[in-house]
Amino acid sequence: MIKNSVEIDFCRFALEPSFKKDGSIHSWEFLTKNVKKKHCNDYLANEVGFCFTSLSDKEKIDVFKKQILTIERLDTSKLKSKPVSLNVDSLISDCILNDKYIGDYLKNQKNIAFEINEHFHEFNTKCSMVDLKCLSKLCPVWLDDFGSGLTSLTIIDMFNFECIKIDKDYFWEIQSESEFFNVINKVKSYCNFVIVEGVETIEQKNKVHSVVDCACQGRLWMSDYYYIEI
C-alpha cells in the first residue's frame, strides 16, 4: 500500500479542465491550491496557485501521494470519464520509479496521465530518456509548458509525448504573430493532441480551436473547476 505520511495536514486541490472545440472536456489537470503543514496555522497559498518550491522534498512527495490517493475518491460523473494529469518533475519521477507500491498503483489507474515539467532533468542532458520511457510504461506521458524551460522541438522529436501543452506565456507571445498556426501545427505533428494554456478570452479560444485536435485551458473556464479538500 502507499504510505500517506504526516508531513502535510491538509490540502485543497483543484481540477482544471481543458475544452475541445465541440465544448466537451478533453482532460483535467490536478492542481494543488493550498496546503497546511503539521503544527502550522497558516495555509501556504496565493491567488495564482500553489508553488511547490515552498515545500521540502518530503513535503512535496507527501502532497503527491495525497493527490494520487485522492483521484480514486473523485466523483466520476463530474470527471466525465476524462483523463486526469498529474504534474511530474524530477523529484516526483524519482519517487514514482523507486517505489514499487506507487508504480503498481499508478499502473492500475486507467485515467491518469503524467504531465512532465519543462525543467525535467533528462531534457538537460538530451540522453536516451530512460526515465521517461519507464514512466510511459505506467501511464501516458504528456509534456507541460512547451515554449519555456528546457523544452524544444529537439526534445519532442526525441520522445513521443501523447499530448503537448503550450505554455501560457509562450502562447501570449506568439498569438498575434503570423507564425502562430505554423508553430502550433508543427508541435502537433509530434503528438496526438495539443492543449494551449492561458486562454482567457473568446477570441483566443476561437483562434486555438481553429486548429484541429487542439484544446484550450485557462481562466475563461474558472467556473468549471472541480475542488476537493482532504
Can you name each region flagged by the protein language model?
Residues S128-D144, K188-V196:
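Short beta-strand/loop segments at the ligand-binding rim of alpha/beta enzyme cores
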Residues M1-K107:
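Bacterial c-di-GMP phosphodiesterase EAL domain
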Residues F64-Q67, S128, F180, I184:
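Aromatic/hydrophobic pocket-lining residues that form the small-molecule binding cavity
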